Amino acid sequence: MVPTTYYLALSGLLFALGMIGVLTRRTAIMVFLSVELMLNAANLSLVAFARAWGDLTGQTAVFIVMTLAAAEVAIGLAIIVAIFRKRETTNVDDLAGLKG
């Protein structure tokens, strides 16, 4: 049986990698993937705590987060594709002109 601390350490590492990706990447797709990595890290920690405490509440929360993440993927990719068609780039620095 793997200790819960290993799962939490992996979750923290994945979250940190996602945060680094959000802060350093300039393409919208990579920022989007980094946010998804952060969501999956949160899911891993929820499952780890649910397993440690023997409660199904954490696993239920994971299904809710996965549903929200699927909606985010659909909407986010649609926005990225629309911006790419309009601007011919996915560089987030070039999108500063969308401020209105």
Curated annotation (Swiss-Prot):
Superkingdom: Bacteria
Phylogenetic lineage: Bacteria, Thermotogati, Deinococcota, Deinococci, Deinococcales
Catalytic reactions of this protein: a quinone + NADH + 5 H(+)(in) = a quinol + NAD(+) + 4 H(+)(out)
PANTHER family per UniProt: NADH DEHYDROGENASE SUBUNIT 4L-RELATED, NADH-UBIQUINONE OXIDOREDUCTASE SUBUNIT ND4L
UniProt-recorded name of the protein: NADH-quinone oxidoreductase subunit K
GO molecular function, one term: NADH:ubiquinone reductase (non-electrogenic) activity
Subunit: NDH-1 is composed of 15 different subunits. Subunits NuoA, H, J, K, L, M, N constitute the membrane sector of the complex.
Keywords in alphabetical order: Cell membrane, Membrane, NAD, Quinone, Translocase, Transmembrane, Transmembrane helix, Transport
EC code: 7.1.1.-
HAMAP family: NDH1_NuoK
Coarse class of the protein's main subcellular location: membrane
TM annotation in the entry: 2-22, 29-49, 63-83
Gene that this sequence comes from: nuoK
Main EC class the enzyme belongs to: translocase
An annotated GO cellular component: NADH dehydrogenase complex
Membrane topology: Multi-pass membrane protein
Family: Belongs to the complex I subunit 4L family.
Function: NDH-1 shuttles electrons from NADH, via FMN and iron-sulfur (Fe-S) centers, to quinones in the respiratory chain. The immediate electron acceptor for the enzyme in this species is believed to be a menaquinone. Couples the redox reaction to proton translocation (for every two electrons transferred, four hydrogen ions are translocated across the cytoplasmic membrane), and thus conserves the redox energy in a proton gradient.
Protein's cellular compartments: Cell membrane
InterPro entries: NADH_UbQ_OxRdtase_chain4L/K (IPR001133), NUOK/Mnh_C1-like (IPR039428)
Pfam families: Oxidored_q2
GO BP terms, alphabetized: ATP synthesis coupled electron transport
